Regions:
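Cleavable N-terminal export/targeting peptides
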Residues: 1-31
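Short loop/turn motifs that connect adjacent beta-strands in outer-membrane beta-barrel proteins
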Residues: 21-34, 61-70, 102-119, 150-158, ...
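Hydrophobic, lipid-facing positions within transmembrane beta-strands of outer-membrane proteins
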Residues: 36, 54-58, 94-96, 141-145, ...
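N-terminal carbohydrate-binding/catalytic regions of secreted carbohydrate-active enzymes
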Residues: 38, 45-98
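Transmembrane beta-strands of outer-membrane beta-barrel pores
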Residues: 40-46, 75-79, 122-130, 161-167, ...
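Outer-membrane beta-barrel proteins
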Residues: 47, 80-82, 107-109, 129-133, ...
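Surface-exposed loop and membrane-interface regions of Gram-negative outer-membrane beta-barrel proteins
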Residues: 72-131
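Detector for outer-membrane/organellar transmembrane beta-barrel domains
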Residues: 136-211
Length: 211
C-alpha cells in the first residue's frame, strides 16, 4: 500500500497543469452541489478476518461555500441473517470527512502544479459501540491538511494527511494518508454511467501500546 501511495504521488507530480478553484471573485458558492445515494452491498471474504456479510450503505457528499463534505453510514447484516459473520458485531459504522477550503476562505488561489485546491481536512469515524464493552470500538477523530489533485485519467483525486486522535484512549496515535477517487468511464445514451470508485487509507507511526 505504501508503494501505491508513492506511485500516486509521483503520477500527480508529473500530471498536466490544473484548472484551479479560483475564488478571488468572492463568489464562494459558485461550485456548490450535493448528492446522496443508497446501496445494498455484499462483502465476500472481507479482510481482516475474511468476513462475508450484507450491508446497507447511505453515501452522501457535497459542497457549500468554504465547506466540502463526504460521508457514509453502513448498517450491517440488514437481513439479520443468523449465518452472517456480522452476528454479534457492531451494527453500524459511520464516517464523516468535512474539509474547509483555504482557497475559498482566504480568497487566495493556492493551486500549484497538479494541486487544484487546499483544505483543512478532518475525518470522524464511529461504530456506535462503547469502549468499556468492546475493546475494538472505533472512535477516531483526525485533523490535517487536504488537497484536490488532478491525476491523468482519474481526474480530480482527494489526497489528505491527518494526525489521529483516539477518542477511546484520549491520546494522539499516529498519522493517516487517505486518497479517494470517483471516475465515470462508460456512458449510456440515457445519461447513466459505469464508474470506478475507491479509496486508500494508510496508517503509520502508531504507538506500540495501542497496536
Amino acid at each position: 500500500m505504501r508503494k501505491s501511495l508513492l506511485a500516486l504521488s509521483l503520477l500527480a507530480a508529473t500530471s498536466a497543469p490544473v484548472l484551479a478553484a479560483d475564488y478571488s471573485d468572492g463568489d464562494i458558492h459558485k461550485n456548490d452541489y450535493k448528492w446522496m445515494q443508497f446501496n445494498l452491498m455484499g462483502a465476500f471474504d472481507e479482510l481482516p478476518g475474511k468476513s462475508s456479510h450484507d450491508y446497507l450503505e447511505m453515501e452522501f457528499g457535497g459542497r457549500s461555500g468554504i465547506f466540502d463534505l463526504y460521508g457514509y453510514v453502513d448498517v450491517f447484516n440488514l437481513a439479520t441473517n443468523k449465518s452472517s459473520d456480522k452476528v454479534g458485531d457492531p451494527k453500524i459504522f459511520m464516517k464523516f470527512a468535512p474539509r474547509m477550503s483555504l482557497d475559498a476562505f482566504t480568497g487566495v488561489d493556492m493551486s500549484f502544479g497538479p494541486v487544484q485546491e487546499v483544505y483543512v481536512a478532518s475525518l470522524f469515524e464511529w461504530d456506535g459501540t462503547d469502549f468499556k464493552t468492546n475493546a475494538f470500538s472505533v472512535n477516531n477523530q483526525k485533523i490535517g491538511l487536504g488537497s484536490d489533485v488532478m491525476v491523468p485519467w482519474f481526474g480530480k483525486v482527494g489526497l489528505n494527511l491527518y494526525g489521529t486522535y483516539d477518542g477511546n484512549r484520549k491520546d494522539w496515535n499516529g498519522f493517516q494518508i487517505s486518497t479517494n477517487w470517483f471516475k465515470p468511464f462508460y456512458f449510456f445514451e440515457n445519461g447513466s454511467f459505469i464508474s470506478y470508485q475507491g479509496y486508500i487509507d494508510y496508517q503509520f507511526g502508531l504507538k506500540d501500546e495501542y497496536s
